[in-house]
Structure formats: structure tokens, C-alpha cells
Amino acid sequence: MAVYCSEQKTRMLKNDTVVGQNMRAYLLSLLMITVSLAGCISNEDNASTDIGNTTEDDLVLPEWQIGDQWLYTFITPQFGEDSTRLVVADVREDDGLFMLGISSEGEAQRHAVINHNPFLGRVTMDGLSVYENGEPQPVFNFPWEAGNTWAFRLLGQDWSATTDNIYNGEVTVSASSTEGHQLSYVFSGRQGFIMSLLWADNEGVVNLQMSLIQKDTGYTGDVFFYRAGDLHDNLYEENDQEIYDSFFDEGYSPNEAWDTLVWYLDVEIDDKGGSGTLTISDQQDGSSPLSRAWGNGATEKGSFGTIPSKTGEHRITLTLQGETSFVHLKVAGALVRSWTL
């Protein structure tokens, strides 16, 4: 009997040991599953916070309406700091285009002659592509996705772009050009346009900065756009003799004349006995719609204006005295478009 009890006790102990081992294995498996699930949940949480509170609407093509407006600060080497308002002036459903104008006619003229604001005029409805050399350029890449790469042409450069980051509805893009220029901008899906932009050349000189001050809707007033074509761009330096040059006004096309010509001047006259004069004359009637004279040490930085467009040759006559004296003259033809909202 004693032997039997001992054997039973031995069996029970063995059974308890097996059960304990099985239980520990079960609990260990459960713990591993729990940790694994916690890791998955943690990874999902981290992935969702990588883009902050960005929504799907922030990543897709924004919907523009007539009267939408963005007030920007522009900084350029020629003009320093200036604020201007970009406005959706028209929606052309027939050809799939927005017309983006500017609330200042002077700013529209600046764009015509120095092209310092690339986001004026025609903008495609299917991607907010802007036009350069008559072709739409995909500056933006909807729907936004981090890591995407693409190419476009803007500001006279061919760019390779990358979507670097997306956070709280703002998309950061960087691009480099074949000539070593750098471009970066932040696009806001919630504001429907660019928050900031910076363009620097291959020497690190910042050619353009844009910063959004305010987004609004329901603009009322006049809006302008000068669609331009370059006619003349030359830098003249000190010369003991009169300088003669010319440019031709052949109109926008054989069937359409320019509405006006826009000129730009950047002038420095030597402060040691320097002087200078400039005249632009119409060869047909002999009129001189633009005349300038500068004395010792004079400067005229980034001035601009308009003269009548007359088909044919325009003659340029300059005098420049002084070792460091120079005149930079640019002329563009422009078709003038305006809207009243």
C-alpha cells in the first residue's frame, strides 16, 4: 500500500511538472504576442505622426476659385523687399486654365521685364503647372508623397526635384538645376499655394525669396498680367565715344502687336568725373520716348516704365564717362491683360 501511494505521488508530481512547463510555455507565448502587437501599434503610431496632422485633402490638388488671393513678400537683388498680392482673376474651363494676376500694375510690369515672379499668368487646372517658354511646367507634384522625384523648367533653369518632407499639411521640396542653382519651397495644402520659396544661383546669391503673409478669398478690385517677350538686354560700360545699339519691335506675332514696351534700368556712374546719357528713339518718326541723363556719382537702381510699342527698329544712343560707369538696359514687349473683380 505504501508502495502504491508512493507511485501515485510520483505520478502526480510528474503531472504537475508537465502542467507547469506547459503553462510557462503558454504564458511566454502570450507575452511574446503581446509585445509583438504592442510593437506593431507603436510602429503604426510613429508612422502616423511622421506627417503630423496632415490629411488626405492636404496632399491633393487644391481647388481654386475666382477671387482667391495670396499676399506675399518678395525679395530680389534688384528691388529689395516688396509685398504684392496674387489673385485668381479668371477660370477658363474651355482650355483648363486659371489666370493668376497681380493686384499691382507696377509689379506686373516688373514681371514682364525681369521675370522675377514666375507664378503669374496661365496656370493649369489639372496640376497648377506654370508656363515657361510657352510650355506648362509641373512645378508641383500632386498628390504629394515623400520621396517622389520629378523634373521641370522654371526661371530659365532645368530642375530635378524631390519631395523631402510632409508635416502638418506642409510639403517641403528641394531641387537642383543642371547649372548648379538651388531651389526650395514649402507648399501648403491648407493655404492652397506656396508658403515660402528660395532660389539661389551657383554662387550662392539669392535671386528670389517669397514668403506668404496672408491667404484670403473674395478679392475685389483690379488685377493685371503683362504677358511678355524679351526684346533687348545689354550691359554698357565706360566708353570715350558714343555708343550705338538697336532692337526690333516685331510684335507678339505677325498678326498681333505688343500693347506696350516695358523698360528696365540699372545704372551706376563713377563718382570721379563720371557722367552718362541714354536715349531710345523710334526710327520711323524720330520721337524719343525714353531719355535719361546722369551726373557724377549718380545711381538709378531697378527703375522701370513703359514706352509705346511701334513696329520696327528702335535706336539706342548712350554716352558713358568714368572708369566704373555702367548702364544695364532691358526692354520687353508686353500684351496687357486686366480684370475687375
Predicted regions and their residues:
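Secretory targeting signatures
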Residues: 1-72, 192, 224, 280, ...
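Acidic, serine/threonine-rich low-complexity disordered tracts
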Residues: 51-109, 129-138, 142-240, 335
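Non-catalytic, beta-strand-enriched accessory regions in extracellular/secretory proteins
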Residues: 235-258
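Beta-sandwich interaction modules
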Residues: 252, 294-311
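Extended extracellular/luminal ectodomain segments enriched in beta-structured repeat modules
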Residues: 253-264, 311-313
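Short, surface-exposed beta-strand/strand-loop-strand elements in extracellular ectodomains
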Residues: 273-288
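Edge beta-strands of jelly-roll/beta-sandwich modules across compartments, strongly enriched
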Residues: 274-276, 323-337
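Noncatalytic modules at the cell exterior or secretory-pathway interfaces
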Residues: 306-324
